[in-house]
UniProtKB/Swiss-Prot annotation:
This is Ig heavy chain V-III region ABE-47N. It comes from Mus musculus (Mouse). This chain was isolated from a myeloma protein that binds inulin. GO terms for molecular function: antigen binding. Disulfide bonds join C22-C98. Keywords: Adaptive immunity, Disulfide bond, Immunity, Immunoglobulin.
């Protein structure tokens, strides 16, 4: 059974920082690109960031709205992916999900700015 479990959300002041984590199980984590996506009433579902494989030198890509503020990373030894969020804004308020190429999703973690 594939499981993705996010953590690290909560309430943060504008301009603050927060780090989200996602632990995966039930599949070979190191073989999958990983994404963070978010959902808010105002913007709906929005892709945030992607990190590729070791064979791709862990290449990363970001939505324009978060570029320069958010950093995605992964630790294949821990089957985990992370999202470091800096200089948070009110418009970053959303439920954040990790996903494997949109095939599998976690339950989400709420970030309120």
């Amino acid at each position: 059974e594939v499981k993705l479990e996010e953590s690290g959300g909560g309430l943060v002041q504008p301009g603050g920082s927060m780090k989200l984590s996602c632990v995966a199980s039930g599949f070979t984590f190191s073989n999958y690109w990983m994404n963070w996506v978010r959902q808010s009433p105002e913007k709906g579902l929005e892709w945030v960031a992607e990190i590729r494989l070791k064979s791709h030198n862990y290449a990363t890509h970001y939505a324009e709205s978060v570029k320069g503020r958010f950093t995605i990373s992964r630790d294949d030894s821990k089957s985990s992916v992370y999202l470091q969020m800096n200089n948070l804004r009110a418009e970053d308020t959303a439920i954040y999900y990790c996903s494997t190429g949109f095939a599998y999703w976690g339950q989400g973690t709420l970030v309120t700015v």
